[in-house]
Design a protein with these regions (language model features):
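Interhelical loop and adjacent transmembrane-helix boundary motif
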Residues: 228-276
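Transmembrane alpha-helices
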Residues: 171-172, 194-230
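Cytoplasmic-entry segments and transmembrane alpha-helices of multi-pass inner-membrane transporters
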Residues: 94-133, 297
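Transmembrane alpha-helix signature in integral membrane proteins
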Residues: 73-101
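Transmembrane alpha-helical segments of polytopic membrane transport and secretion proteins
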Residues: 1-26, 286-298
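C-terminal transmembrane helix and the adjacent membrane-cytosol boundary/short C-terminal tail
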Residues: 173-177, 181, 188, 255-298
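Amphipathic cytosolic juxtamembrane alpha-helices at the membrane-cytosol interface
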Residues: 15, 94, 107-112, 180-181, ...
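Generic hydrophobic transmembrane alpha-helix motif, especially the helices
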Residues: 119-164
């Protein structure tokens, strides 16, 4: 057994103190996650028990302030899923192609301009995205498609697809820049074109980092509230059309929490628990993708 010895020099004391600080920071991070998890389950489970898991998760009607309240969150769940998937279908290809352009093809001057624009985009507050969407996008959707109102699922998808771009682009560029140049040089030496090399060599080699950026973008989309609340219409409808006014999980909480009480407030905590579980699942999938990518690379 290794004998314990007290630090005897200033450098050793400093090392011991820093190790203790690092350890405490790690414990603090884990503790915060544990406290949040416990609180969410303790706050969210009671209402699910009172309402009934099936009625709560698969009920199609939400009327929390009616004389006979109904607490079905299926419209919220589906709206969040459809909105996130729709934003991903737009944002992921655009973000990935932008990252390839910045990493492999852009001239230095152009790269600096685009990178600066992406960084500025990442710093814009959610409420600004929502305001622009409400003033520009919503009227445009109503006019182009001949609808009475443009506040709908489609508007939310477009806004979210723009909001997730910085996460996808930034992380993907970093991953692509980390690909060893020997991989691309070997491909070019064998007669492959630049485009073939980027899509068949560079992107597969950087897949774990790109996947991380995509999952971060998805997490941003599913957790967004303010911008979505300003453009989606906020009606608890089933999302059976892109032009339907809908409510997401996040906006349901933000819209009613200020005046909720009793079972209604407990139900909102249950919605937060469902959202929390979604985020946890996304993080688990991210770790699985990263571990799988690392094993393949080894």
């Amino acid at each position: 057994m290794k004998k314990f010895e007290l630090p005897c020099t200033p450098a050793q004391w400093l090392e011991a103190v820093m190790n203790a600080i690092f350890f405490l920071c790690g414990i603090l991070a884990v503790g915060c996650v544990a406290v949040i998890t416990i609180y969410m389950f303790l706050s969210g489970l009671p209402a699910i028990g009172k309402i009934g898991p099936l009625k709560f998760l698969f009920g199609t009607e939400w009327a929390s302030t009616a004389s006979e309240p109904k607490y079905g969150i299926l419209p919220f769940v589906l709206s969040s899923i459809y909105g996130t998937l729709g934003a991903s279908l737009i944002g992921v290809p655009v973000g990935l192609l932008t990252a390839v352009f910045l990493s492999k093809a852009a001239a230095p001057g152009v790269r600096n301009v685009v990178v600066t624009a992406v960084e500025l985009l990442s710093g814009i507050p959610s409420v600004v995205f929502g305001l622009l969407g409400m003033q520009v996008l919503v009227p445009a959707v109503a006019k182009v498609f001949g609808k009475a109102s443009g506040a709908c699922l489609l508007s939310a998808i477009v806004v979210l697809s723009i909001m997730i771009l910085p996460s996808i682009v930034s992380v993907s560029v970093t991953a692509l820049n980390a690909v060893p140049p020997e991989y691309e040089q070997g491909s070019l030496a064998l007669g492959a074109t630049d485009t073939e090399t980027w899509f068949k060599i560079s992107i597969p080699a950087a897949r774990s980092g790109i996947a991380a950026g995509i999952v971060l973008g998805i997490g941003r989309a599913i957790g967004e509230a303010m911008a979505v609340m300003m453009v989606a219409g906020n009606s608890p409808n089933m999302p059976d059309s892109l032009f339907r006014s809908v409510t997401f999980l996040t906006t349901a909480i933000a819209k009613e929490m200020s005046y909720a009480s009793g079972l209604q407030k407990q139900a909102l905590f249950s919605i937060a628990l469902v959202l929390f579980v979604f985020i946890m699942v996304i993080n688990v999938l991210l770790n699985a993708v990263l571990k799988g990518g690392n094993k393949d690379e080894k």
